[in-house]
């Protein structure tokens, strides 16, 4: 009975309450969203007009960082926390363009993400999607071990997701990063970035709006210093060549970058290796 209830919750899509995953999909120009998500984005754009450019830049960063990890560090195993809806150049596509044997575990608990993700990935044996709350690190590791060998280097991605996590006893961002790093072998990497603003009015306004729109399924906009503090978790060593910065400027390559006309908030973070 409990399994049946869990499965029912997993497949139930609330089309009347915006979800962060569907809002992000809309900002990227996707089609996996509902009127409520589009209306919520319209409200968000009134407060932070550069949000669409921010979302596009963040997606380009995700592609760059996965490609960099695969080429420079030779890592072939990826954990993508809060993976979101499938779009172009997903993590497994970028990683497998470097090495087709690369393995990717997507972690999300949005029912629409799970539905479309499974349909999209059912033919790829090196990809697994887990219907998990990303704060449940131990359970995720146990399930991910079906295709991930934790005795070898893994890339743990927390890209544009920790702002969805509240600062509570169940699993605040630092605890999530700490718990994940404990699982990782030396030579692994961790990527962290989240939405930040140095303007307290923007932080408060966007946080309040997103909590209201998503039915309180949101954490908060943080400061650059708070994100930098996540990189002080034991065993993490920031990649010194680049450091922490607006991810639009993280190792820019031939990808076209559409600059934010205004910068009410940015996506801030970087990459760290695991000692």
What are the residue ranges of the model-derived segments?
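Conserved S-adenosyl-L-methionine
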Residues: 24, 235-254
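Anion-recognition interface
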Residues: 170, 197, 203-204
């Amino acid at each position: 009975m409990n399994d049946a209830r869990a499965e029912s919750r997993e497949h139930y899509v609330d089309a009347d309450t915006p979800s962060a995953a569907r809002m992000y999909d809309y900002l990227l120009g996707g089609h996996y969203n509902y009127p409520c998500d589009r209306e919520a984005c319209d409200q968000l754009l009134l407060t932070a007009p550069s949000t669409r450019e921010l979302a596009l830049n963040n997606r380009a960063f995700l592609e760059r960082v996965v490609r960099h990890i695969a080429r420079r560090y030779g890592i072939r195993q990826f954990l993508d926390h809060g993976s979101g809806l499938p779009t172009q150049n997903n993590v497994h596509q970028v990683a497998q363009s470097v090495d087709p044997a690369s393995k990717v575990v997507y972690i999300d608990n949005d029912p629409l993400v799970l539905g479309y993700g499974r349909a999209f990935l059912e033919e790829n044996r090196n990809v697994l999607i887990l219907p998990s709350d990303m704060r449940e690190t131990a359970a995720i590791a146990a399930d991910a071990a079906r295709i991930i060998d934790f005795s070898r280097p893994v890339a743990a991605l927390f890209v544009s997701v920790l702002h969805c996590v509240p600062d509570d006893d169940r699993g605040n961002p630092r605890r999530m990063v700490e718990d994940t790093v404990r699982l990782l072998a030396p030579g692994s990497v961790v990527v962290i970035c989240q939405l930040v603003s140095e303007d307290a009015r923007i932080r408060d306004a966007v946080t309040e709006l997103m909590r209201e729109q998503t039915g309180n399924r949101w954490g908060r906009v943080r400061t650059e210093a708070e994100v930098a503090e996540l990189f002080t978790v034991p065993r993490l060593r920031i990649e010194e060549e680049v450091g922490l910065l607006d991810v639009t400027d993280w190792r820019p390559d031939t990808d076209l970058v559409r600059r934010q006309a205004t910068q009410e908030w940015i996506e801030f973070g970087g990459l760290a290796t695991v000692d």
